[in-house]
């Protein structure tokens, strides 16, 4: 149980950096999920008090059609993002939690841990840079200069580069 609490504490250690970045970008902190303390009784009868914490839930796309459809929709959304909107990082860890989710079985692997930590670090490293890069790429003056001096292929490469960074590739 110490390992479980250590994982929650690790996610909690990012909170100050996430809060600071979200205040800079959006003017406010995310609606944090409040930890729910609880007690577990081990097989030897010992009671262990845990503080609780955040863990990124992942749904098993192979376990139900609804979960598979949601995974497909998320993938399509990410692929279209660079074409119709500005490229950005994944930030599910800043979103409010749903009260109830049905028909989407959980994925019982450590994938949530690995992808969750990766998403947080990637967002902290690149989100603000992507905002600035996308602002530059949308500038008509810069667009015209790139196209005139280097051609439309160069402009497309910059857009692809930003989209790849946003995706984490």
Regions inferred by a protein language model and the residue ranges of each:
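Structural preference for well-ordered, secondary-structure-rich domains
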Residues: 1-169
């Amino acid at each position: 149980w110490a390992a479980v609490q250590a994982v929650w504490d690790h996610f909690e250690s990012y909170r100050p950096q996430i809060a600071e970045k979200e205040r800079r970008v959006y003017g406010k902190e995310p609606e944090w999920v409040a930890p729910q303390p609880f007690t577990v009784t081990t097989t030897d009868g010992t009671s262990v008090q845990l503080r609780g914490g955040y863990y990124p839930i992942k749904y098993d796309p192979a376990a139900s059609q609804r979960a598979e459809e949601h995974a497909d929709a998320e993938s399509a959304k990410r692929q279209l993002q660079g074409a119709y909107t500005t490229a950005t990082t994944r930030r599910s860890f800043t979103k409010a939690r749903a009260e109830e989710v049905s028909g989407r079985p959980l994925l019982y692997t450590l994938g949530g841990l690995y992808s969750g930590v990766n998403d947080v670090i990637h967002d902290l490293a690149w989100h603000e840079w992507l905002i600035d890069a996308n602002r530059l790429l949308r500038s008509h003056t810069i667009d015209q200069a790139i196209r005139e001096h280097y051609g439309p292929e160069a402009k497309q490469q910059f857009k692809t580069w930003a989209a790849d960074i946003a995706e984490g590739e």
